[in-house]
């Protein structure tokens, strides 16, 4: 058995799960998510617990078993508690502001970068004096949230010499020493 796939998924109170024709729908206080499951993987819901089974111990089936268990678990957690990520802008003159779902980033380029966020992602920006600006993103969809964070981070990746760029809060950037002075 797959170490991850064999684990049951407990559905918390306030979250409803429906399974119909290999499509799993999870509704909760934070939103609604839908995931299509491979027809080879069998998904059952009994007494508030989701179980996944596979037909054979074939390598492909073992991989899919763990994959879909993790995806459905992420959906249940996302719809009940939600996911939150914080990005920090490190650098002189780096600024961020938002107007609704439009993010305005000033990252030292000759132009500002505007990013339209999907409606499933809630965004909040914090800019305090003498502190690095923060972007706080919340969503029920873990995959979408990670993709948006990676896109924002790609505009100015943290560099190893001064540590300037967009990084996750609490992330350690591996630093390098600069050029050694000549004799």
UniProtKB/Swiss-Prot annotation:
PROSITE patterns, sorted: RIBOSOMAL_L6_1
Gene Ontology CC annotation, any one: cytosolic large ribosomal subunit
Keyword list, A-Z: Ribonucleoprotein, Ribosomal protein, RNA-binding, rRNA-binding
Biological process terms in GO annotation: cytoplasmic translation
InterPro entries listed in its UniProt record: Ribosomal_uL6-like, Ribosomal_uL6-like_a/b-dom_sf, Ribosomal_uL6_a/b-dom, Ribosomal_uL6_bac-type, Ribosomal_uL6_CS
SUPFAM superfamilies linked: Ribosomal protein L6
Annotated TM spans: none
Keyword Hydrolase tagged: no
Keyword Ribosomal protein: yes
GO molecular function: rRNA binding; structural constituent of ribosome
Pfam family, one: Ribosomal_L6
Subunit structure: Part of the 50S ribosomal subunit.
Role of this protein: This protein binds to the 23S rRNA, and is important in its secondary structure. It is located near the subunit interface in the base of the L7/L12 stalk, and near the tRNA binding site of the peptidyltransferase center.
Entry-linked HAMAP family: Ribosomal_uL6_B
Protein name: Large ribosomal subunit protein uL6
